[in-house]
UniProtKB/Swiss-Prot annotation:
The keyword Metal-binding does not apply. This is Nitric oxide reductase FlRd-NAD(+) reductase. The gene is norW. Pathway: Nitrogen metabolism; nitric oxide reduction. It comes from the Bacteria. It is found in: Cytoplasm. Its EC number is 1.18.1.-. Its cofactor is FAD. The keyword Cell inner membrane does not apply. Keywords: Cytoplasm, FAD, Flavoprotein, NAD, Oxidoreductase. One of its GO terms (cellular component) is cytoplasm. It comes from Salmonella paratyphi B (strain ATCC BAA-1250 / SPB7). Pfam families: Pyr_redox_2, Rbx_binding.
Length: 377
């Protein structure tokens, strides 16, 4: 490959791919282009920065220059890719262009901000850069409203509460983690957050935000209002597909790829939070790690389809941690729950008596790997 491989993006997926490529080929030309600084940080740490009194710069693990030297790369930080000419195999920015043999989109996902009046007052915590922009406001805020009771919203609510802040957690659903598991399973976390002092506003929808002398007034559709100092949107992520669309690559929820991580264009691939693999968006660390292993082989001439085993998803709520696996979101499962003082085991069984999903908490998490082996996939 005389022109080599170009990767657009610098997050976890891009870095894992670089490391796997270099394990197999030390010399193939590798170029990374990204809009950020390209410094490495651990994104899951963003769920704990407030209670641990960390500044944005504290999260940096490796500077971009060190990464480039370690893995023999060309890096172009703070560079916005404007267009891709897929037929000519050319990536274009405003003032540069690069030719490639293989191109990988690792453009990640952006935080969704509800389209309400005053949406510009909402903060997001989806990157080190976003945290850097609002860290002073979040440290100084005493009253915090978090919109969204999913994984990230629940993690942030616990973290801000542990930091001594007054926290309100709002969601349209009737329970936390509603897209992941039924209420009888998530209720243990829900009760624990309430006991910690988190105020839950479930079955509630935000209508507007207004700046006031005292802070921010959040008004619900019910016309109930609360005064807070900061509002965080944790309402999910949207895969970044705009660049793929401009390149003429097929997109749906994410950039559509097959089991080889290949898009509708034979020399363009996608990985990580932006990718939709055979109809599934999997924005979790383990599938990204496995995707990087397989994609590295395929970029270097292999023909290895990605095979994903049953995998654990970890909810990083330190005072009541959870692991889950399988089809926990299915509504037709029969849940068998054993809850004791040291933790919970919840098993989702099919009508045929097969274990299709499970959730474990606290000290019972040590049983997760044994359950994983018996999971029907």
């Amino acid at each position: 490959m005389s022109r080599g491989i170009i990767i657009i993006g610098s997050g976890f997926a891009a870095r894992q791919l670089v490391k796997n490529i270099r394990k197999q080929d030390a010399h193939v030309p590798l170029t990374l282009i990204a809009a950020d600084s390209m410094d490495e940080y651990n994104k899951p740490d963003l769920s704990h920065v407030i209670s641990q009194s960390q500044r944005a710069d504290d999260l940096t693990r490796q500077l971009a220059g060190e990464f480039a030297e370690q893995f023999n790369l060309r890096l172009f930080p703070h560079t916005w890719v404007a267009d891709i000419d897929a037929d000519a195999h050319v990536v274009k920015s405003q003032d540069k262009q690069w030719q490639y043999d293989k191109l990988v989109l690792a453009t990640g996902a952006t935080a969704f901000v509800p389209p309400i009046t005053g949406r510009e007052l909402m903060l997001t915590l989806n990157s080190q850069q976003e945290y850097r922009a609002c860290e002073t406001q979040l440290r100084d805020a005493q009253r915090v409203l978090i919109i969204g009771g999913g994984l990230i919203g629940s993690e942030l609510a616990m973290d801000f509460c542990r930091a001594g802040k007054t926290v309100t957690l709002m969601d349209n659903a009737a329970s936390l983690l509603a897209s992941l598991m039924p209420p009888e399973v998530s209720s243990r976390l829900q009760h624990h957050l309430t006991d910690m002092g988190v105020h839950l506003l479930l079955k509630s929808q935000l209508q507007k935000l207004e700046k006031t002398e005292a802070g921010i007034r959040a008004t619900l559709v019910s016309q109930h209002s609360i005064e807070v100092d900061a509002v965080i949107a944790a309402t999910g992520l949207r895969p970044e597909t705009a660049l793929a669309r401009r390149a003429g690559v097929a997109v749906n929820r994410g950039v559509c790829v097959d089991s080889y991580l290949q898009t509708s264009h034979p020399d363009i691939y996608a990985i990580g939070d932006c990718a939709e693999i055979n109809g599934q968006v999997l924005p979790f660390l383990q599938p990204i790690q496995l995707s990087a292993m397989y994609l590295a082989k395929n970029l270097l001439g292999g023909n290895a389809p990605l095979k994903l085993p049953a995998m654990l998803v970890k909810v990083k709520t330190p005072e009541l941690p959870l692991h889950l696996a399988g089809e926990t979101q299915r509504r037709d499962l029969s849940w068998h729950i054993t809850a004791e003082s040291d933790g919970m085991i919840a098993k989702g069984m099919s009508g045929e008596g097969q274990l299709r999903a499970f959730v474990v908490s606290e000290d019972r998490m040590k049983e997760a790997f044994a359950l994983l082996k018996t999971l029907s996939v």
